[in-house]
Amino acid sequence: MGFNIISAAEAASYVKHGYNIGLSGFTPAGTPKAVTPEIAKIAEEEHAKGNPFQIGIFTGASTGDATDGILSRVKAIRYRAPYTTNPDFRKAVNNGEIAYNDIHLSQMAQEVRYGFMGKVDVAILEACEITPDDCRRRYCSDHCAIGR
C-alpha cells in the first residue's frame, strides 16, 4: 500500500461546507499550516458566489493564525472547540459569528470519540515525513493523501 502526494489545494478540496474537521497539533507547532489557508481560499470563493461555506473545527488546543486567524477572517468557522488564543477568532466569537465550546482540553478526545461533537468528516495532520514503511504498518489508511 502506498500513499498519494497531492497539493495542499487538492487536500483542501476534500473539505465541504458543513463538514467537521479534526486538526492535529497542540499549539501552532503541530498544527497544519499548508492546507488551512487553502480552505480559506475556498471559503472566500464560495462566499463571493453567494454560497455558504463554514466548517466545524476540533483540535487539541490553540492552533495559531494559520488556522484560527485566517479562517475567522474569511468567516469560514461555524463551530470550534476547544481552547484557542487567536485575537481574530475571539473577536468573531464575541460578535456572535462563531459558536465556541471552551471545554477543558482533557475532555476533547472523549467528547469526539463518543460522538457528542458530531462526526469528524476530514482529519488534517501536520507531518514531517510519512514513509512506505508507515503505510505497510497500517499507520496510513487506504485513503491517505499527503498535501504539500
What are these regions (language model features)?
Residues 1-148:
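Conserved alpha/beta enzyme-core scaffold
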